[in-house]
Amino acid sequence: MGIIKFDKVTQVFGDLCVLRDITVQLTEKRIAVIGANGSGKSTFVRLINGLQLPSNGFVSVDGLDTKRDAKAVKRKVGFVFQNPDNQIVLPLVEEDLSFGLKNLNLSKDEIKKRVDEILQRYDLQAFKNHAVHLLSGGQKQLVAISSVVAMKPDYIVFDEPTTLLDLRNKRRVTQVIEELPQTAIVVSHDLEFLKNFDRILVFDKGEIAIDDVPLVAIKEYIRRMS
């Protein structure tokens, strides 16, 4: 069983304290992170794969320290941004899916195999040679997710992956997340989507205010927000 640990983690940007003395262990398969804007939730998930490093305290993934073992952690933890344009780096779909794989020292045959598998799994074969910038927002997000899944990390972090999407594409992306074999940590405001998760962390002013199963956490979150 994998485990992500935060040990007395504080995150400060200038004079602003974004996270305060966070100690928590994450072992569940589906974990949601919610809270008001500015509550610290995005900073929290960015610490998991080393996109940001803690000002104080320690973050580890399966025993690997995000500071000391940065490269190994990034291979274990994939990250999907809210805006796929922040993640897509090459002009064609197939090229973009291959990009990250080339950093894993895989053979050309293995890269091609993984790309073909991903294209088929997510019904993207027809877009294989398409320019990414011509795709819809939902299709772009699917390409961004696919590029991470193809690298076969143990964990995937999603920072509000459906916020910019219409209802149809939002449903498609949430379905993809639900079917992932990997552990998923998801920042989202879509409470309906999160009802089937294993655990929800609610952030408020840089602290974990609620940590419970969805039925309890969502009810308490709504009560506090009303």
From Swiss-Prot:
Tagged with keyword Cell membrane: yes
InterPro entries recorded: AAA+_ATPase, ABC_transporter-like_ATP-bd, ABC_transporter-like_CS, ABC_transpr_CbiO/EcfA_su, ECF_ABC_transporter_ATP-bd, P-loop_NTPase
Domain ABC transporter: 4-225
Entry superkingdom: Bacteria
Record-linked Pfam families: ABC_tran (PF00005)
GO molecular function, one term: ATPase-coupled transmembrane transporter activity
Key words, A-Z: ATP-binding, Cell inner membrane, Cell membrane, Membrane, Nucleotide-binding, Translocase, Transport
EC number(s) recorded for this UniProt protein: 7.-.-.-
Residues the entry annotates as binding ATP: 35-42
Gene Ontology cellular-component annotations: ATP-binding cassette (ABC) transporter complex
Signal peptide location: none
Localization annotation: Cell inner membrane
Topology in membrane: Peripheral membrane protein
Family: Belongs to the ABC transporter superfamily.
Biological function: Probably part of an ABC transporter complex. Responsible for energy coupling to the transport system.
Name of the molecule in the record: Putative ABC transporter ATP-binding protein BQ02700
Protein source organism: Bartonella quintana (strain Toulouse)
High-level lineage: Bacteria, Pseudomonadati, Pseudomonadota, Alphaproteobacteria, Hyphomicrobiales
